[in-house]
Regions:
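Small-residue-rich anion-binding loops in enzyme active sites
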Residues: 1-14, 154-160
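Patatin-like phospholipase
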Residues: 6-12, 20-122, 128, 134, ...
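Extended hydrophobic secondary-structure segments that form protein cores and membrane-embedded regions
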Residues: 12-15, 47-55, 151-154, 231-236, ...
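Glycine-rich beta-alpha junction loops
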Residues: 152-159, 210, 235-240, 305, ...
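A short, conserved beta-to-alpha structural element at the edge of catalytic cores
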Residues: 226-246
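C-terminal helical/tail subdomains of lipid-metabolizing enzymes
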Residues: 275-374
Length: 374
């Protein structure tokens, strides 16, 4: 049997970068928002407390938080991905459809044309089109005023420091008035894309340093024991795969390991933190009330919110076992998948993401007593 449902539910979402693989996240987010509608019943408060993202995950996150409500978020995501989809003739073979993005994605990026200056290039594409796309599909007034914490990351090219652009103040960090450039900066992956300048500082894609901004989402949760805290992490990358057979596959596998392994390391770190929190709670239970300085006592109580790490739920969008359970054919992304914005690929990924997330999250919500068990 699952646990008894609590009356207050906090949900956080972490979105990875991965180029066109972000269509998996698109489908998964739609499923999550629909299930949130299903559990949001009278007498229960369901809150989306945080959405953090990197690169294409930052763009998806902006559509969710930069919306008036869950219905509006779904509409904005669908409109965004319609614009990012490349329509190709039906008689084209898959490889040609995939590689068409090398010539640009009109709502995202276009090739540089100053070929006479090629020896001074530091990037291959112009990302100005994405600024217009973000302005069209994200309500930045709603995003900046939202109660949902929004955090995206980017790397200061010169200093190497990881910058966080957030719509809420946090500790000593002031809030940022989020605009299209902050979101674009999080997705400015070299050498394809140029650095994005903000206030005289040039930024590259935050995924270079950390492709899964887990901690920023965790810190948005409350420390109350009366709240059911659920953190959903969208994982785009396979842990295991057959040996690469050519240089393109080598590069793709390198990206999978580079961008996917950090999440697994964070989970191991999370287990250690949980043990420390458990120790703090046990100490707090035997220390006489009022014997600690108020500030220290408050910090010990606040430590409880980090136990949310026990409730991290990976929606592994590349898990063959989960795909089999969902009744989906086992498939493997071919080389160059990160740039495949063709209509067939986007629809397939959306549909897979939706089905896998719906299956995984439906079970999760049943276990938390939020939905009736089947």
């Amino acid at each position: 049997m699952g646990q008894a449902a609590k009356n207050e539910i906090e949900i956080g979402v972490v979105l990875q970068g991965g180029g066109a693989l972000g269509a998996y996240e698109f489908g998964a987010i739609i499923a999550l928002l629909e299930l949130m509608d299903a559990i949001d019943v009278p007498g229960r408060k369901v809150s989306l407390v945080a959405v953090t993202g990197v690169s294409i995950g930052a763009i998806n996150a902006a559509c969710v938080v930069g919306a008036k409500d869950r219905t509006d978020a779904r509409r904005r995501l669908r409109a965004l991905w319609t614009e990012l989809t490349l329509e190709t003739p039906s008689y084209w073979w898959a490889g040609a459809s995939r590689d068409l993005a090398l010539l640009g994605v009109p709502g995202f990026y276009t090739p540089r044309r100053d070929v006479w200056n090629v020896f001074n290039w530091t990037n291959y594409y112009d990302t100005e089109p994405m600024l217009g796309t973000l302005k069209k599909h994200v309500d930045f007034d709603s995003l900046n005023a939202s109660k949902t914490a929004f955090v995206v990351t980017a790397v200061d090219v010169a200093s190497g420091e990881l910058a966080r652009f957030r719509n809420h103040p946090h500790k000593k960090e002031a809030k940022t008035e989020i605009g299209p450039r902050h979101v674009l900066a999080s997705g400015s992956l070299p050498p394809g894309f140029p650095a994005t300048p903000i206030n005289g500082i040039n930024f590259w894609d935050g995924g270079i340093v950390d492709n899964t901004p887990l901690g920023d989402a965790i810190e948005a949760f409350s420390g109350s024991g009366d709240v059911d805290r659920i953190l959903v992490v969208m994982n785009l990358f396979r842990k295991s795969r057959a040996l690469p057979k050519n240089m393109i596959e080598v590069n793709d596998r390198l990206d999978e390991l580079r961008y996917g392994n950090r999440l697994r390391q964070d989970r191991e770190h999370a287990h250690t933190i949980n043990e420390l929190v458990q120790t703090i709670e046990e100490l707090a239970a035997v220390i006489p009330a009022g014997s600690l300085e108020p500030e220290l006592e408050a910090r010990m109580v606040d430590a409880g919110r980090f136990k949310v790490l026990d409730a991290i739920t990976d929606v592994d969008l590349a898990d063959p076992d989960l795909m089999a359970e969902a009744g989906l054919p086992l498939s493997s992304e071919e080389s160059g998948a990160f740039r495949d914005f063709s209509a067939d690929a986007i629809k397939r990924r959306h549909d897979i993401g939706y089905k896998l997330a719906h299956l995984k999250l439906n079970k999760l919500f049943e276990a938390h007593g939020l939905l009736p068990a089947h």
